[in-house]
Each structure stands twice: as C-alpha cells, then as structure tokens.
Amino acid sequence: MTDHRTRFLQLALDADALRFGEFTLKSGRLSPYFFNAGRFDSGAKTAQLAQCYADAIEAAGLDFDLLFGPAYKGIPLATALACAYAGRGRDLPLAFNRKEAKDHGEGGTLIGAPLAGRQVLIVDDVITAGTAIREALAIIRAAGGTPSGIAVALDRQEIASDQDRRSAAQAVAAEAGIPVIAVANLGDLLAFAAGNADLVGFQEPLLAYRGRYGTDTTG
C-alpha cells in the first residue's frame, strides 16, 4: 500500500472519521465500517487530508487546471486542496456551486474562478449514488468547462445492486468518460485493518461484506 493511503486511513481513524462496528447505511445495508468526512473538523486535520488527496492525484497523473468542489462537503475539500497545491508551488483556480441560486449580488449558482476553457478536477468526499457528481458535471459543462477527473477520499467499491454489478464510481466514470480516483478504497482498508492489531477483529466482517457487496475490482 502506498504511503498516502496508509496516512489517510490512519488520519481518518484518529479523527473518528473512520469507524468500525455495525452501521446501517442509507441503502439499508449493514456495514462493518462507516466513513464520515465531516469529522475532519479542524484546520490541522483538513490540511493533512488535503496532502493525502494531492499525493493520490499526483500518483494518478491527472491532467487539470481548475479545482471544483460540489456543495456541500466538496467545498472545504477543494479549498483545502487548492491551499495544499499552493504550498507545493502550484496556484490553482478554484470554484464551487451553491445548492440554491441567488437572485441578488453576483447571482447564479457558481462561485469562484470562471470555468470556461478549463480542465476541471471535481473534488468530493465519496460517491454514494453519484447524484451530486452528476449535477457537478452538468454545471461544469454548462459553464464551458471540461471535466477531466474526479477525486474522492474513499471508494467503498460496492455494487449498486444485484442487477448492476458496478459501483457508483465505476458507473459515473463510464458515463462521463473520465477517471475517478480515490485516496483509498475498500481493498486498502482491508490491508490496513490486517496490519493494525486493534482492527484485526474486523477482518472477518470486512471480508464478508466485500464478498456480498464488493465489485470485481476489490481484490
């Protein structure tokens, strides 16, 4: 496992953003783990998270020249990532959307740098159903930008349903024709748990969950 994956998972565990136990997801599935990016709730935690994103993005070799954060969780993530890149000597423009359009002031649903003519990297926490990402793709294209990739913190690598054996991330990538990369995925989480004495007891539930709901790429 590459260093940014290990650092991210340990950071998430320390921040209580990554928890193990029994959790009922929105899908109704009973999961042995739960990830909540909202627990990266301080400047130091968010800055460290952004460095993990930057390392994962650079390792993937994505080509982009603007960062876009979908409302709501994508906004602080993209902002922190822009700061991380600035610290590495690359000053990237940044934009995000509102959930509700304003009819006063600058108006509209977009805030930040113009998207026209830009290669846009979308930054979010996870892709669950893919609704927010699909909305972001439409917004970017309508504003004259070109989506070039999507970066998320954690890919659960779960099938959408027994009828559709793809994950939400795989479905979005296929529809949009762009790469979706994650700082870490379920396979990384399994390796991380196996190497952590405090988490060894969760190996069996994690493996069982992957066997039931995992895509063909989780091995």
Swiss-Prot record:
<feature type="binding site" description="in other chain">
    <location>
        <position position="26"/>
    </location>
    <ligand>
        <name>5-phospho-alpha-D-ribose 1-diphosphate</name>
    </ligand>
</feature>
<keyword id="KW-0665">Pyrimidine biosynthesis</keyword>
<dbReference type="GO" id="GO:0005737">
    <property type="term" value="C:cytoplasm"/>
</dbReference>
<feature type="binding site">
    <location>
        <position position="104"/>
    </location>
    <ligand>
        <name>5-phospho-alpha-D-ribose 1-diphosphate</name>
    </ligand>
</feature>
<keyword id="KW-0808">Transferase</keyword>
<dbReference type="InterPro" id="IPR029057">
    <property type="entry name" value="PRTase-like"/>
</dbReference>
<feature type="binding site">
    <location>
        <position position="128"/>
    </location>
    <ligand>
        <name>orotate</name>
    </ligand>
</feature>
<keyword id="KW-0460">Magnesium</keyword>
<feature type="binding site" description="in other chain">
    <location>
        <begin position="124"/>
        <end position="132"/>
    </location>
    <ligand>
        <name>5-phospho-alpha-D-ribose 1-diphosphate</name>
    </ligand>
</feature>
<feature type="binding site">
    <location>
        <position position="98"/>
    </location>
    <ligand>
        <name>5-phospho-alpha-D-ribose 1-diphosphate</name>
    </ligand>
</feature>
<feature type="binding site">
    <location>
        <position position="156"/>
    </location>
    <ligand>
        <name>orotate</name>
    </ligand>
</feature>
<dbReference type="InterPro" id="IPR023031">
    <property type="entry name" value="OPRT"/>
</dbReference>
<comment type="subunit">
    <text>Homodimer.</text>
</comment>
<dbReference type="InterPro" id="IPR004467">
    <property type="entry name" value="Or_phspho_trans_dom"/>
</dbReference>
<protein>
    <recommendedName>
        <fullName>Orotate phosphoribosyltransferase</fullName>
        <ecNumber>2.4.2.10</ecNumber>
    </recommendedName>
</protein>
<feature type="binding site">
    <location>
        <begin position="34"/>
        <end position="35"/>
    </location>
    <ligand>
        <name>orotate</name>
    </ligand>
</feature>
<dbReference type="InterPro" id="IPR000836">
    <property type="entry name" value="PRibTrfase_dom"/>
</dbReference>
<feature type="binding site" description="in other chain">
    <location>
        <begin position="72"/>
        <end position="73"/>
    </location>
    <ligand>
        <name>5-phospho-alpha-D-ribose 1-diphosphate</name>
    </ligand>
</feature>
<dbReference type="GO" id="GO:0004588">
    <property type="term" value="F:orotate phosphoribosyltransferase activity"/>
</dbReference>
<keyword id="KW-0328">Glycosyltransferase</keyword>
<dbReference type="GO" id="GO:0044205">
    <property type="term" value="P:'de novo' UMP biosynthetic process"/>
</dbReference>
<feature type="binding site">
    <location>
        <position position="102"/>
    </location>
    <ligand>
        <name>5-phospho-alpha-D-ribose 1-diphosphate</name>
    </ligand>
</feature>
<dbReference type="Pfam" id="PF00156">
    <property type="entry name" value="Pribosyltran"/>
</dbReference>
<dbReference type="GO" id="GO:0006207">
    <property type="term" value="P:'de novo' pyrimidine nucleobase biosynthetic process"/>
</dbReference>
<comment type="pathway">
    <text>Pyrimidine metabolism; UMP biosynthesis via de novo pathway; UMP from orotate: step 1/2.</text>
</comment>
<dbReference type="GO" id="GO:0000287">
    <property type="term" value="F:magnesium ion binding"/>
</dbReference>
<comment type="similarity">
    <text>Belongs to the purine/pyrimidine phosphoribosyltransferase family. PyrE subfamily.</text>
</comment>
<comment type="function">
    <text>Catalyzes the transfer of a ribosyl phosphate group from 5-phosphoribose 1-diphosphate to orotate, leading to the formation of orotidine monophosphate (OMP).</text>
</comment>
<dbReference type="GO" id="GO:0046132">
    <property type="term" value="P:pyrimidine ribonucleoside biosynthetic process"/>
</dbReference>
<feature type="binding site" description="in other chain">
    <location>
        <position position="99"/>
    </location>
    <ligand>
        <name>5-phospho-alpha-D-ribose 1-diphosphate</name>
    </ligand>
</feature>
